[in-house]
Design a protein with these regions (language model features):
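Left-handed beta-helix
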Residues: 6-199
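Conserved nucleotide-sugar donor-binding
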Residues: 1-3
Length: 199
């Protein structure tokens, strides 16, 4: 396209559209019956997920089946509803496991094939596919994606580099060993809230 320069940052909405109008080139719009939600940055993504869970985005429904008021699940979610504390709006992806004693406070989204271990707390957080949140871990206002933990403002850290990958890891890993004596000592020091993941 000859109006987009190569080799430099160029935004369609901020650069191209104004350039077309400025040069009196054809530029058309069409009314559409949907709501545009921009997710260019982490805070935007965070806001979009919250808005969907709270029913604020027109023509977008929470996927899955509503199993309790404000709590939606995909297929084959393993949970004993009498032994967990879940306050919606919450979405739990298919094939996920929520262990007894876990707490999930919405708006929160847990992707497919996740494991939220006993005593873990997920509060206003987004957990991506195949994440395992260890016993007693408390996540508030966090986004967990692979080996990264991201705050809602975009600040992040690498769980492996921070040596916290024994608390939050890939649910598909089979090589998990018993926590080291140092890790057990840290858990005892921190008490029932095993760890608050830092901002």
């Amino acid at each position: 396209f000859n109006h987009i320069p190569s080799g430099e940052k160029f935004d369609i909405g901020a650069d191209l559209f104004p350039k077309l109008v400025e040069n009196n080139l054809p530029f058309y719009a069409l009314p559409m019956d949907f709501e545009w939600v921009d997710i260019g940055k982490v805070p935007d993504y965070w806001s979009a997920i919250r808005s969907v869970l709270q029913g604020k985005v027109r023509q977008v429904d929470i996927p899955g089946k509503e199993v309790k008021p404000g709590v939606y699940t995909g297929l084959n979610v393993a949970v004993n509803w009498d032994k967990v504390n879940i306050t919606g709006p919450v979405y739990i992806g298919g094939m996920s496991r929520i262990e007894d004693g876990a707490t999930i406070i919405g708006p929160s989204m847990i992707g497919p094939s996740c494991c939220i271990c006993e005593g873990a707390t997920i509060d206003n957080s987004i957990i991506f596919d195949y994440s395992k949140i260890g016993k007693g871990v408390r996540l508030v206002d966090k986004l967990v994606f692979g080996r990264y933990c991201v705050g809602k403002n975009g600040d992040h850290f690498d769980l492996q580099e921070a040596s916290l990958d024994w608390l939050i890891t890939d649910s598909r890993r089979m090589d998990l060993s018993e926590p080291s004596p140092q890790q057990k000592a840290m858990a005892e020091l921190l008490g029932s809230d095993l760890i608050n993941i830092p901002d």
